[in-house]
Amino acid sequence: MRRKGDFSGDIARKENYYKAFDHASKNKHGKKAITKFEADLEKNLSDLLYSFENGTFVTSPYRFMTVHEPKKRLIGMLPFPDHVQHWAMLNEVEDYFTRSFSAYTYGGVRGRGPHAYMRMIRKVLRKYPERTTDYLLCDIHHFYPTVNHPVLKSQLRTRIKDNHLLRRLDEIIDSVEGDTGMFPGTKLAQFFSLVYLYLFDHDLKRCFHVGECPALVEYYTKRYIEESIATAKTEHDYEELSKGIQYLSDRFKGYLNRLDFCYRLADDVLILHEDTVFLHLVIEWIGLYYANELRIGLNPRWKIGHVTDGVDTGGYVHFPDHVRVRKRNKVALCRQIARLRKKGLPDEEIRRRASSRIGFIQHADTSNLLNKLGMETPRKRLGQVIGIKKVRGRISRPTGNEIRGYTL
């Protein structure tokens, strides 16, 4: 894989540090730390640039905060100058690395957030119903606390050969004591999580290259056939078995060529497929890959099921022909609206205060729910937006004098 080695010169530019300040302070100019930094902006940016060039910048001590929604998580917070330094490096590195990420990686990638992830799943389920009857959903057990430092450094070196930059990134990684662990809460931590898993995405797409090893193909083909026979329950299963051993063998080898519908949102992996027996083998391979290549653990609460029962991922529950919102999010919205109504607030004010949850829920098929809550916000047609209305009655014709008075 081709590597790039001339990042430091592009990073150590005053224009880049001004850009980094803009990114780090976006929508936060009211904070005291940013106001103080901005009061002597030229000197502060020059000091950060100098410390990067000379390798004297050291990550500040973390402050910690525990959040409990949606689950308990320890957030590591750094002073504002650290964020500017991180952004200065990311301005040059992020886009270069993003080109290496799988097109089916969502979350933390510009233009590919949770809603793009949701739209992709909806599109695939409707376009390929026969090939997406079943699903596998899994994630990493305590991802951030178990990130392995040597593995992360190795992943960075697959694309970067600028030793000066690598030493700066290594210092940030090692600012967390021990050989494992990373604190969410900074843009750079989010970027590191993407780098950590980007090779996994490509290997997963190719079924971890099992098809390239004849011994593994023979072993897993035998297991696939045996488990297909042992788990057959429906008429469709028995119909497939009646086609013979050779048919099952060829079908399994065809599956090994490529996983067409696999997606990742943060550390959540979703695979849509037509065969649950094959998915049970895939989850075994994922667990082995995590343990051997990434030194992390698979969450034992993985799930394989039928799409008709609903795929609960990214805050939504996907079905073949519609999308519902996760019950937890629906209940949270209902309770928030009930609390605001008790205060006697008008609907417009309630809609404004609950706009975040309403906006999230609107992406699912929830028009009935919003109508019951009195929070419906119908989307206007283009004609309504620009004020065009149909003209009723006859159109008045110009008189002869008006025609004669018109010149070309």
Where are these regions (language model features)?
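Non-catalytic, polymerase-adjacent accessory regions of viral genome-replication enzymes
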Residues: 1-46, 401-408
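Active-site-proximal segment of RNA-dependent polymerases
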Residues: 3-7, 90-148, 218-219
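Short, conserved non-catalytic motifs in the polymerase core
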Residues: 29-35, 60-84, 100-112, 173-195
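Amphipathic alpha-helical blocks
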Residues: 37-61
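Conserved polymerase palm-domain catalytic core
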Residues: 44, 51, 124-266, 270-285, ...
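Right-hand nucleic-acid polymerase module
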Residues: 78, 87, 213-257, 277-281, ...
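A common structural junction motif
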Residues: 287-296
